[in-house]
Amino acid sequence: MSVLDLNALNALPKVERILALAETNAQLEKLDAEGRVAWALENLPGNYVLSSSFGIQAAVSLHLVNQIRPDIPVILTDTGYLFPETYQFIDELTDKLKLNLKVYRAAESAAWQEARYGKLWEQGVEGIEKYNEINKVEPMNRALKELNAQTWFAGLRREQSGSRATLPVLAVQRGVFKVLPIIDWDNRTVYQYLQKHGLKYHPLWDQGYLSVGDTHTTRKWEPGMAEEETRFFGLKRECGLHEG
């Protein structure tokens, strides 16, 4: 697998870009998670960044990537509506793993947004998408630009939802390479990794949460629910960061 030309790939239509990466992805599927990170660091351009929502299994990708690339910038888009337990988890992991945390927020405060738009998350799919654009997508785009990122690591897994079921290890998104080292991991593999390295799930895991985002759009799991139904009232799975 050779070094890939980001500018050339960005110039291609999406379908052609996927086809251009197909052979590389076939090889990456054969590597383990650590091998994928190492390959990316050797073959893809820097600067390198890692994004995290500090959700249920966040400790896995944070530990995995940071141990191979210490001091990699870790991007958090903070909406201002995270659970108290999430903010505590962020502090705990930042200290334990010595993370180079970079926090990005919307230009407007949460209170100002509510005054201007009302509670967007109560305004159906259109409102949720506007909320996500303001609080997740724009801050992430700004982070990638300010950090001059060309390669972006993230901890998505195919098992998490239908929208992630066919994601490849390597793609181009928002003009940069995107690498998903643990994309093919199942819940058992996640658990084993956490146990092996003395890491914890998010504190709300023990209270019945399978996925954690903002307080107003996250539900506990109940029998019969798919994991993706615990977010955004079942109307959406993605917050916008991993779409497009």
From Swiss-Prot:
Keywords: Cytoplasm, Oxidoreductase. It is found in: Cytoplasm. The lineage of its organism: Bacteria, Pseudomonadati, Pseudomonadota, Gammaproteobacteria, Enterobacterales. It holds the Pfam family PAPS_reduct. GO terms for cellular component: cytoplasm. Its EC number is 1.8.4.8. The active site is at 239 (nucleophile). InterPro entries: PAPS/APS_Rdtase (IPR004511), PAPS_reduct_dom (IPR002500), PAPS_reductase_CysH (IPR011800), Rossmann-like_a/b/a_fold (IPR014729). GO terms for molecular function: phosphoadenylyl-sulfate reductase (thioredoxin) activity. Catalyzes the formation of sulfite from phosphoadenosine 5'-phosphosulfate (PAPS) using thioredoxin as an electron donor. The keyword Oxidoreductase applies. Its main location: cytoplasm. It comes from the Bacteria. This is Phosphoadenosine 5'-phosphosulfate reductase. Signal peptide: none annotated. SUPFAM superfamilies: Adenine nucleotide alpha hydrolases-like (SSF52402). Pathway: Sulfur metabolism; hydrogen sulfide biosynthesis; sulfite from sulfate: step 3/3. Belongs to the PAPS reductase family. CysH subfamily. GO terms for biological process: hydrogen sulfide biosynthetic process; sulfate assimilation, phosphoadenylyl sulfate reduction by phosphoadenylyl-sulfate reductase (thioredoxin). It catalyses: [thioredoxin]-disulfide + sulfite + adenosine 3',5'-bisphosphate + 2 H(+) = [thioredoxin]-dithiol + 3'-phosphoadenylyl sulfate.
